[in-house]
Structure formats: structure tokens, C-alpha cells
Amino acid sequence: MNINVAELLNGNYILLLFVVLALGLCLGKLRLGSIQLGNSIGVLVVSLLLGQQHFSINTDALNLGFMLFIFCVGVEAGPNFFSIFFRDGKNYLMLALVMVGSALVIALGLGKLFGWDIGLTAGMLAGSMTSTPVLVGAGDTLRHFGMESRQLSLALDNLSLGYALTYLIGLVSLIVGARYLPKLQHQDLQTSAQQIARERGLDTDANRKVYLPVIRAYRVGPELVAWTDGKNLRELGIYRQTGCYIERIRRNGILANPDGDAVLQMGDEIALVGYPDAHARLDPSFRNGKEVFDRDLLDMRIVTEEVVVKNHNAVGKRLAQLKLTDHGCFLNRVIRSQIEMPIDDNVVLNKGDVLQVSGDARRVKTIADRIGFISIHSQVTDLLAFCAFFVIGLMIGMITFQFSTFSFGMGNAAGLLFAGIMLGFMRANHPTFGYIPQGALSMVKEFGLMVFMAGVGLSAGSGINNGLGAIGGQMLIAGLIVSLVPVVICFLFGAYVLRMNRALLFGAMMGARTCAPAMEIISDTARSNIPALGYAGTYAIANVLLTLAGTIIVMVWPGLG
């Protein structure tokens, strides 16, 4: 039996789609030196090659893909978006605006200089900035811009062509820039990171190991009684001196949870909770020959929970003001916008931040109730909320505004982005509403993006040879300019106008470009994860601004003549 693969794929859109995805994802795992191609470029290359052979796909699949992707971008940005927009993220907001705004202006100028159409110009902007949200926003606006069918088809083909030709240029140039730009300025990045560490008293070790607290029991002997000198637990400050917390005391056979007024007596058996290294550093008066193994004394449920910051008495406070250790709890991680932050006592908490806290189950629950809520470790997605807000986003995108003979609307991209932000924001405020496991959200976002990339590649593939020969050199030059010049402008603005610490500034610059590989290079150069503070500050707002940039470039293009 002979199987005509070409006819089989042409006759089955679903089969063609998943063949493109499978081959593209395999290609995306290849590495060029230290650079991995990535899923997006892998799927795009395969779809362009198959598009050259005149394979095509139903445009409805393409539309659904970009809608799912942009909605999930909004959901991820939602918990931190408003706190960055309205409060102490002024510098980060300004940096993101400078980065995106300068790239937009430069792209418009180069597009007019080289005589490109809006499709090539917007695609070049998206590729040079390695930003799929720009591509999605521009594509959606083009479809709702009232072009005739043939002109629209050409613009969309050129959009994906411009993206394909400049994506690797943008990625490689930014990674190279992240490696060498810190060496060209007069302040050493490692020194800047250490300066912040000294000012804020935080750990500069990017590879800090995180242990769970353990519980061990000791009998109070004469040396320990002498060491306490009659002081109660509050006066002693056991945690400050030892790094351990007295969780239980057995006295005369009675087990109790001590308060701050308790005074240790000869023969008491105490349960200490702390990290392993804290137990190792205990004074010999605690340890030598004094450890006991008492089932009841050691029978404690030590848990680790992810606590979401929500309540007004925690939002806007510094981490040190929570006094977690005074309540017998230990902080392991601080996560903002899926980015792990340095544990810094001076970090100002935003609504939606996640604190990984360990300790006795009762104490962790008490802390969680005081500052927010324990994240639901559920694998069940609130599909009702997901679908309802998706519908709301589509309805917002249908709204149009009429000015004389000119009309414009938000479009599906902006509508879905706004609805996603609102769902993410409400989830951060109401623990039982709109829950979407991070794994499920990432899967839907990635799948939507891959479907979209497959669609645009198949659509543009037939014209890539002609386009590459005619404008390849121009695209190379434009891609380098749009990728690197806004980074330099952003650096000058942050260093000499905002006067930011260089470690935080370089992290914020990579966040404004939403480029994780470049962020890793900055952290390696600084030998610290302190730049992650800046990266998290600009990342969420940049995702939103980049989507809007895709819409704006299409809307202002006709007015430039």
C-alpha cells in the first residue's frame, strides 16, 4: 500500500498541525553553542519549510492559538500588574516604557526608510525584540483594520516573514550584549550587587541551598540553666542567638507550648525547630550528651506551604516587618511573577507575591491567615472562570469607537489581555476564585503560542525565498539596531536619569525585554541573583506594553505617510 504523505497532510489540517508541532519542538531542542533554538523558532522554521511546499492550515486554528496565548499572558501578569503600575514600581514602569517606546519609534523609522509595508515593519519589531506578544497584537489589529483581502493576506505573510528573519538576530544580539555591555560601563556588576547586599542585608549567593527545618529535642542541664541566667524566652531571644525556635517544653511529664514568659528549668526537655546548620551551630551547653528521643516531644507536623500575600496589613510592608521567625516560621523562598527573588528583609511585598514558609502546621496556618492565604495545591482548574473571562475579553475586543469617518477598536488581543489581567488580579485577592494550576496555565499558553507560530509559518512559507533575497540584508541591519539601540538608551536613562544601582538596572533591562536567557547571563556576571529584583519589576508590565506596541504600530502606520 502506497501512502501519499503530501495528500494526507493537505487533506487533514489537524494531522498537519501536530506534525509541524512535533517536528518543530524537536528542532527547538537543538543548541548552537550555549544558545538553544527554543520551541518558538523551531516550530516557525518547520512551518516555513512546509509552507514553501504549499501546505496550509485553517486560519481558525491560528486565531484560537493566539487568543489562548495572549489571555494566559494576562492571567500571569495580573497579580502584580497593578502594584507595579500604581505604587513603588515607578522606575521599573519608566524603564519598560523607554525600552518598548524607543524600539517602536526606531522600527517605524526604519520601516519608512527601507520602504517596507506595515507587515514587514511590525514583524521586524516583534522578531528583533524576541517578543511574540508584539506579533500577536499586530496580527490581530491587522485583521480588524479594514484592509481588503489581498492586501491583508500580504501584510500577514510579511508579518511572519519579518519575525522569522529577525528573531535569531534579536536573541543572539541581546545575549551577546548582556555578556559584554556590563563590561563597557565603569561600574562592576558584582560590586554593585554586593553594595545592594550590604545595604539590605541579603544573601548574594545565587545558588543558595534551601533546606527544610528539622526538629530535635534536648534535656536542660546545669550549663544551659547557667547560660540562660534566669531570663525568660522573650528576653533570651533564642532564635537570634541560635537560629532555632523552642516549639515545645516537657516539664514534670507535662507537654506544653511555651510562651515568651517561660523560663527554662533543670530537667526540662525542649524541642528545637531550625535548619540543620542552625542545629550544628548550637552552643555545647545545648548539645553535648543532652539530646533525647521522645516520640511525643518530637511528634510535630512540620509543613511547607506557599502563602499568597493578599491582606492589607502585609501588602506594602517590608519582609522584615512580618517577623516570621518570631512566630516560629521559616522563610524559604519569595516568588514574584513566577520569578524567585533574593530573600531580602527590605523587599516590599506586593499583592500576589508567594512566600514559601515552613514550620509547625498550626503556626504556618496562623501566619497565612494574617498575611493572605495558603495557595490551593489542587490540580483542578476553575474552567468556569477561565471561559467566562475569555468571553468577556472577546466582547471587549468587539467594542469600536467612531470619530467622524474614522473608527477603531481594541481588538481581540487587547481585550483578552485586559480580561486575563483582571482574572489574575482577582485570583490574587480571592483564593477560591479562578484557580488555574501554574502547570496548566503554562501548558495552555505554550500550546496556544505553538499553534499560532505554526499557522503564521505555513502562511508565509511560500514567499520566503523571494523575501529573503530582496530584503535579507536590510533585515539584518534593522534587526541589530532595534535589538540593541533601545537597550543602550534604556541603560543611559536608568543609569544617569534614574540613577539606579547597576545590578538592579541590568536585571530590569532584561525584564523589559522579557528575555530569560539574557537574565541568566546577567546573574552569572554579577555572581548573584540580586538582578532578579529588577527583572521581576519590569517583566509583567513589559509583557503588557509589548502587546500594546503591536497594536499601536499598526494603528499609527497609515498616518506617517
UniProtKB/Swiss-Prot annotation:
Domain RCK C-terminal positions? 200-288, 292-373
Query: Transmembrane residues, as ranges?
Result: 8-28, 32-52, 66-86, 94-114, 158-178, 383-403, 406-426, 451-471, 475-495, 540-560
InterPro entries reported in the protein's UniProt record: AAE_transporter, RCK_C, RCK_C_sf, Transp_YbjL_put, YidE_YbjL
User: Which residue stretches, if any, does this entry annotate as coiled coil?
Assistant: none
GO process annotations (BP): potassium ion transport
Q: Which domain of life is it from?
A: Bacteria
Q: Which UniProt keywords apply?
A: Cell membrane, Membrane, Repeat, Transmembrane, Transmembrane helix, Transport
Q: Does the keyword Transmembrane helix apply?
A: yes
Subcellular localization, as worded in the UniProt entry = Cell membrane
One term of GO molecular function: monoatomic cation transmembrane transporter activity
- A GO CC term attached to the entry: plasma membrane
Please give, as recorded in its UniProt entry, the membrane topology of this protein: Multi-pass membrane protein
Q: Identify the Pfam families for this entry.
A: Asp-Al_Ex, TrkA_C
Tell me the HAMAP family matching this sequence.
YbjL
Assigned protein family: Belongs to the AAE transporter (TC 2.A.81) family. YbjL subfamily.
Read off the PANTHER family from this record.
Answer: K(+)_H(+) ANTIPORTER SUBUNIT KHTT, TRANSPORT PROTEIN YBJL-RELATED
What is the name of the protein in this document? Putative transport protein YbjL
Which organism is the protein's source?
Escherichia coli O139:H28 (strain E24377A / ETEC)
